[in-house]
């Protein structure tokens, strides 16, 4: 993702800016830390957010368009009915986050800690998880199209009513994955991974 660093407006206090504006465009936010905040119906676009910590917070009906998040921490934050369009998360921490009724479109997660994250009742299209941890995460009741996992850690992930049809998992860790036959059907796996999924057939290997 290439967001021009020129003509970005440096802001110091995100909450103050949000109180004064419904839409924030071409901003740069760095070294910002806060927690337990609630942000409602805000749109942020064409911006870069670096080294920012916003934890244990709640974003509702917010839109993030053309945003680059670098080295950010949003642990245990709820994103309710939000949209992420052409966004990129690099080296971020999203542990324990809840993405409920979200739209994720053309969005990349690169080297991100998403362990214990919940993504539910959401639409995911053209989403890329590269070298990203999704241990003990929960994907439930989602509509997905053209999502890609590259060397992602899906250990003990729970996937229900979220079809992985056509998705290549062969380079991912899937130890202890909980998934139904219908959801894993037509996904690509390797021979070792097949042993982790043999339980779905109700048989034992001796």
Each model region followed by its residue ranges:
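Tandem repeat scaffolds
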Residues: 2-206
């Amino acid at each position: 993702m290439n967001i021009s660093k020129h003509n970005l407006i440096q802001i110091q206090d995100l909450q103050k800016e949000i109180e004064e504006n419904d839409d924030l465009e071409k901003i740069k936010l760095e070294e910002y830390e806060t927690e337990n905040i609630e942000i409602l119906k805000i749109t942020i676009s064409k911006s870069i957010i670096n080294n920012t910590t916003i934890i244990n917070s709640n974003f509702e009906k917010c839109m993030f368009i053309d945003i680059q998040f670098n080295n950010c921490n949003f642990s245990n934050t709820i994103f309710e009915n939000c949209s992420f369009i052409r966004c990129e998360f690099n080296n971020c921490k999203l542990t324990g986050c809840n993405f409920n009724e979200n739209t994720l479109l053309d969005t990349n997660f690169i080297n991100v800690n998403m362990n214990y994250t919940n993504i539910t009742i959401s639409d995911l299209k053209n989403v890329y998880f590269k070298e990203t941890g999704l241990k003990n995460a929960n994907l439930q009741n989602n509509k997905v199209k053209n999502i890609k996992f590259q060397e992602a850690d899906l250990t003990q992930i729970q996937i229900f009513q979220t079809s992985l049809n056509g998705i290549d998992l062969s380079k991912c860790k899937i130890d202890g994955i909980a998934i139904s036959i219908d959801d894993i059907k037509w996904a690509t796996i390797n021979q070792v991974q097949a042993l982790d999924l043999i339980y779905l057939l109700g048989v034992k290997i001796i």
